[in-house]
Amino acid sequence: MSFTVVIPARYASSRLPGKPLADIGGKPMIQWVYEQALQAGAEDVIIATDDKRVSAAAEQFGGKVCMTSPNHESGTERLAEVVEKMAIPADHIVVNVQGDEPLIPPSIIRQVADNLAGCDAPMATLAVEIESEEEVFNPNAVKVVADERGYAMYFSRATIPWDRDNFAKQDKTIANPLMLHIGIYAYRAGFINTYVNWQPSALEQIECLEQLRVLWYGEKIHVEVAKEAPAAGVDTPEDLESVRAIVAKQAQ
């Protein structure tokens, strides 16, 4: 089973400008992500960017680049442009790996591709069991519930499912496992264009979760439990320092 990884990499991050080029252990962040994707066994790895500085950095380490429009409103729109420009066949599997996850395990990149290959959905993703009370009630931690076959029923920033009896207690015991969504997706390439041509749905606008558009229009997303929990991505200067510390420790 072959698959392609596309890594959207925007230079203009509001919280951390120039994020793809941030130095981590002597390499730009985007190079870390690229190398993790190669280790996953991808047939092709493509960096999708709208900035020549990112493109130039990628070319220095031998990365393959697709220049994209600066006007995309989402990473999925950027993905659709790559599929069109690179003439990726409709039945080919494309994995979208965020450009700010330098420590993403190659195993889960491969896993989400295998997940899609083994089901009849046009899209697949991963989740891990929530272990901390803080994440259960944190709206930035997106929860997912799936049916008995692993197809997503809903994604939410709210606490789903709501454990009525246990959450009524003062200590809000986590008696039943809740699943935390991991933001990595595999798509059948032909579906990406279908997705971006749908109008945004009311639910995705309320929750600010793009994947809800897929469920709104009656399509399926298959969810599998990740074999390995990924490290946190880099959204802030503090996150960047944490990743640098991890890399420095591993190098010792």
From Swiss-Prot:
It catalyses: 3-deoxy-alpha-D-manno-oct-2-ulosonate + CTP = CMP-3-deoxy-beta-D-manno-octulosonate + diphosphate. SUPFAM superfamilies: Nucleotide-diphospho-sugar transferases (SSF53448). CDD domains: CMP-KDO-Synthetase. Pfam families: CTP_transf_3 (PF02348). Pathway: Nucleotide-sugar biosynthesis; CMP-3-deoxy-D-manno-octulosonate biosynthesis; CMP-3-deoxy-D-manno-octulosonate from 3-deoxy-D-manno-octulosonate and CTP: step 1/1; Bacterial outer membrane biogenesis; lipopolysaccharide biosynthesis. Its EC number is 2.7.7.38. GO terms for molecular function: 3-deoxy-manno-octulosonate cytidylyltransferase activity. It is found in: Cytoplasm. The keyword Cytoplasm applies. GO terms for cellular component: cytosol. Disulfide bonds: none annotated. One of its GO terms (biological process) is CMP-keto-3-deoxy-D-manno-octulosonic acid biosynthetic process. It is an enzyme of class 2 (transferase). Keywords: Cytoplasm, Lipopolysaccharide biosynthesis, Nucleotidyltransferase, Transferase. It comes from the Bacteria. Belongs to the KdsB family. Activates KDO (a required 8-carbon sugar) for incorporation into bacterial lipopolysaccharide in Gram-negative bacteria. This is 3-deoxy-manno-octulosonate cytidylyltransferase. It comes from Vibrio campbellii (strain ATCC BAA-1116). The gene is kdsB.
